[in-house]
Amino acid sequence: MIEKFNLGLLDLLSILLPGGFLIGLAWQSGWLEDWPMLSGIPEGWASGAVFAASAYVLGHFIHMIASYLDELVFEKIKEKKWPDQTLVKEVVQIKDSEIGEIDRKHFNAFKWSLAYLMQHQPMMYQAVEKHIAESKFFRSFLIVLLVASLWAFVQQSWLEGLLSLGFAFLSLVRYATQRQKSIESAYQYVIAAKGKGRQA
């Protein structure tokens, strides 16, 4: 129960924090000061509620844009840094034996592994989901930091821009490593679970 709450909180923060950070950046730049929707809001809890709701909505758009990094960036990093296909080939064989051959574009080995663990090994699925949630957070934060660095350079704030780029690089590293951990963990858990099933 506590583990599910922690994962839910991490998922929420992966949406809320990047959105809140970007709204704060826009407010600091003066873009939102004359926005009609915000001019009539009183101080106090109402303004906080509007900020939280706006951050949540904006965070979803950031999440949607950031999801394209999986194919555009992560897959290229994976080919160079983690080229070994042993685990995925083993899982594909297990998947094909369970549900037959399906076009990988529609139902790849990773998606099937998550579905299998969710149905048959929920504790293993939660362990994988932790890596997924963390990778999503840093994936979204990477987009925010790139926007922040661009804004800083436009304002000729060179130090802030370089710092934002540095943190963006660290976010990219963390996103890629956690994404890879989630994939490897899912494959390993499926192989281990099927091995136990055969022994039983």
Label each PLM-derived region with a short phrase.
Residues 1-88, 155, 173, 177-178, ...:
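N-terminal first transmembrane alpha-helix
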Residues 30, 80, 93, 121, ...:
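Short, flexible coil/linker elements and helix-boundary hinge sites characteristic
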Residues 66-125:
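Charge-rich cytosolic interhelical loops and cytosolic tails of multi-pass membrane proteins
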Residues 71, 126, 130, 181-188:
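Charged/polar, solvent-exposed surface patches and flexible loops
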Residues 103, 107-111, 137, 147-170, ...:
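A contiguous, surface-oriented mixed alpha/beta subdomain in the mid-to-C-terminal portion of proteins
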Residues 162, 166-200:
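Alpha-helical oligomerization segments
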